[in-house]
Amino acid sequence: MTEVKFMPPAAKFLKKLKDKKLKTLYQEAIDKIREDHTIGEAKNGDLAGLYGYDIYYNKTNYELAYKVEYVDNKVIIVVMADTRENFYDELKRYMKG
């Protein structure tokens, strides 16, 4: 099975999630991405090489940003997870830093 690693911003957000339903939706999204990494929307420009996956819950749009790396096997790296508000600005800042 494809390995999944979490960068600090994603790990922190997912660890702080208290809502069990939302946490389950994120886990289901990660499982879907693990099966087919092209399921997310490929980003371009400053975010080329990343994919974005939308999660809708309780009238709020949540995002999951990830990239795929090949070492010995395919590894999916979850870069960031959060609400849609300012998500891509934060993601760009993190990727540049």
Q: Where are the model-predicted features located?
A:
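Enriched for short, Lys/Arg-rich terminal
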Residues: 57-63, 67-97
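A short, surface-exposed loop/turn module that caps and links secondary-structure elements
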Residues: 31-58
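Conserved catalytic core of Hanks-type protein kinase domains
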Residues: 16, 32-33, 81
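Arg/Lys-rich, positively charged N-terminal/basic patches that mediate binding to nucleic acids
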Residues: 1-29
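Short amphipathic C-terminal alpha-helix that caps PH/PH-like domains
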Residues: 30-31, 95
